[in-house]
Amino acid sequence: MAIYSQVPWTLPRYKFEVKVHPLAATSNLQPDDGYKIELRAENTVDKYPAKQHARRVAAQIRQGLGLIFLMGQKSTLHEDSDQERSLRQRRYFFYLSGVDEADCDLTYDIKTDKLTLYVPDFDLRRAIWMGPTLERKAALRKFDVDEVNYHSALDEDVKKWAKNQDTGSTIYLLHGSQGPAENPPNVTIDSKALKLAMDACRVIKDEHEIQLIRRANDISAAAHLEILRGIKSMSNESHIEGSFLNTSVSLGAHKQAYQIIAASGSNAATLHYSKNNEPLKGRQFVCLDAGAEWNCYASDVTRTFPITHQWPSIEAKQIYQLVQEMQESCIALVKEGVRYLDLHFLAHSILIKGFLTLGIFKGGTLDEVKKSGASLLFFPHGLGHHIGLEVHDVSPQSIMAQGINDDSNNILILPTCVSPCTTSSPALISGMVITIEPGIYFSQLALDNAKPEQLKYIDMARVKNYMAVGGVRIEDDILVTKTGYENLTKVPKGDDMLEIIRQGKKGNDSPCVDRPTW
């Protein structure tokens, strides 16, 4: 049976129809088969729902009155240079505006339900050199706001608002340093409640946000497929990075959600390897962790693959299949109400059972090995994280919170485990988008610093046979639903992946995605 999925969605100005399918009539790919992603666009109007977001945040604050004040990212120069830094919009500002332009601010009057955007005043010299900035009428048409004023009116508007408020009214700031030029004397400044309220809202994605993440994933899928098709002609990690960037930009994604990781051989044992400059010759696997960004929303996709269309060694195949089992078993259990941490524990249990079978672990039961923490030497990070405006997106608690031991499972949760992979994280809720990204890594540094209670269960002679594997990670972006999940990542794995590599590029396969006509 041919694999076929059709996903229509709406983005600002365009409606896209996406089809991801192998061009085959049966489940077995044939030499002339291939994966193709089709993107078709038609004009529509669908603004980013900034006003809806503002109302949700205000409801979370629960104070009834007050003014939300948010500053956007300012234009800045590189140190000791006249060259501007690339804009990366402040994500909290974007959530309440949908504006990906520099030097803008906003206010939201909770009582009157009025969302006001402030755009830069016209600057003739800058317009001649850089092009015009946002004009008020154009901004009002483009963004989901009630009013647009020039930035020069901001301070006076805040003063006017304060004069009409009772003493003790509140201005809500994200940070104490990001407020009005002068704090009105009759109002209270609160720099704590707003972030907590926005984090609680951002963790549950609305339909518009889901479609943006879906779009980012489809562009990433196209880029990953292009690399699988061309990997046999690549000789350096830099070629992989360059190919991913080329496909992403050609499809309109000019920014990456994070720095590309194109790690071959033992480099894949470094979780966030980023040099991407070493030759591929003699390496067994490449671990490619790369995700495009679309309209400030991230994708996060990892695939591990050989340089050729065959498993490079029996050890490489064993580890890949074990990681794939870890991932597929965890994804299958995702639904509302599930505790994500239990999926993390499940992944460790599958790893331990697999290592006991392979002889990498020895001399203990599953529970004994688990209690020792030996599996953490090979799987040292959390199973995944939230994804949205940030690749490691926010949650109701700080994503940098210190981890805690869970005595019921005897698995140490490291500080690198972030929400929802902590003991204090709430159960999964419909509308969350999470990653499931188990990995197995053979890091000499980790093994050299292992504790005696961990080494007790490790057959180091056996481990040596696997060191050349480097590292294997497989990662998908998963939308939580009330009854299950939707996998937003459409990149082949396992044998399907090997078949794509074997087929290589044919004819006009580059790029492997039909560019939308916008």
Curated annotation (Swiss-Prot):
It comes from Ajellomyces capsulatus (strain H143). SUPFAM superfamilies: Creatinase/aminopeptidase, Creatinase/prolidase N-terminal domain. Catalyzes the removal of a penultimate prolyl residue from the N-termini of peptides. Gene3D superfamilies: Creatinase/methionine aminopeptidase superfamily (3.90.230.10), Creatinase/prolidase N-terminal domain (3.40.350.10). PANTHER family: XAA-PRO AMINOPEPTIDASE 3, XAA-PRO AMINOPEPTIDASE AN0832-RELATED. It is an enzyme of class 3 (hydrolase). Mn(2+) 1 binds at residues 300, 437, 475. This is Probable Xaa-Pro aminopeptidase HCDG_07916. Binds 2 manganese ions per subunit. It catalyses: Release of any N-terminal amino acid, including proline, that is linked to proline, even from a dipeptide or tripeptide. GO terms for biological process: proteolysis. Mn(2+) 2 binds at residues 289, 300, 475.
